[in-house]
């Protein structure tokens, strides 16, 4: 488990609660790595999210271990403790984390910030959110049929975005990408520009909260409440969770 990203590489920071990490997280990371020829996707469980004062269901150590199990053996996927809880119990802010990561990159290294559509649509609420795309260009996984107007409307105050026709990262241009990617440019009032990458039509009908409900046996199938065994069987059948993660949840008695 790496504490920091390797120097001189093309890296995407992928922060989140990972409570628990599921197949949707992995699908987003796979798509980003293939589309933009990333060397590494850094999965970084967050210690304390400012916008979730109620905290997470599982503790930080459990979420780190589940994430490690989820990415184990997958080339280019690593777990980072860069967003670990602070000794002061202060919130973890994405901008501060990205600035720290970028400072550690050797010359020639590139840092991106990877997120799903839900995170992007809440970006306006993040601390100093208008600065984030200029520290680490955004890679956003959108839902099928997501109108571009929704993306424009979600931009932090003072930012605009336009399509960057024909633009393609140099590393990606060497080979046809395995996943479609659309390129844009984000501009701020100071005249600065930053690339923005959209992974369109990435269908992921899954959420961590739904998984937690399933584990608790809280979903209804039209007949009655599912038993605990039936809920866990459904998780396995539908491949919502990597098997090692589900085994860990069972062993630790999480989300009951």
Spans of features found by a protein language model:
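Nucleotidyltransferase catalytic core that binds NTPs
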Residues: 1-256
């Amino acid at each position: 488990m790496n504490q920091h990203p390797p120097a001189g590489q093309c890296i995407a920071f992928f922060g989140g609660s990972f409570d628990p990490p599921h197949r949707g997280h992995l699908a987003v990371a796979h798509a980003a790595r293939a589309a933009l020829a990333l060397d590494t996707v850094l999965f970084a469980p967050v210690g304390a999210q400012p916008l979730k004062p109620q905290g997470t269901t599982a503790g930080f150590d459990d979420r780190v271990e589940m994430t490690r199990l989820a990415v184990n053996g997958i080339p280019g996927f690593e777990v980072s403790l860069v967003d670990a809880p602070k000794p002061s119990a202060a919130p973890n802010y994405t901008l501060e984390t990205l600035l720290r990561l970028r400072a550690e990159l050797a010359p020639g290294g590139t840092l991106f910030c990877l997120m799903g559509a839900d995170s992007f649509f809440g970006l306006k609420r993040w601390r100093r959110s208008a600065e984030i795309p200029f520290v680490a260009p955004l890679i956003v996984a959108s839902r099928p049929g997501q109108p571009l107007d929704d993306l424009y409307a979600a931009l932090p105050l003072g930012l605009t975005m336009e399509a960057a026709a024909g633009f393609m990262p140099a590393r990606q241009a060497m080979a046809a990408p395995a996943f479609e990617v659309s390129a844009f440019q984000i501009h701020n009032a100071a005249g600065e520009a930053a690339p923005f990458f959209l992974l369109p039509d990435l269908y992921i009908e899954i959420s961590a909260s739904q998984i937690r409900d399933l584990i608790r046996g809280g979903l209804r199938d039209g007949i009655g409440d599912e038993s605990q065994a039936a809920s866990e069987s459904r998780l396995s059948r539908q491949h919502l969770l990597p098997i090692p993660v589900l085994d860990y949840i069972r062993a630790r008695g999480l989300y009951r």
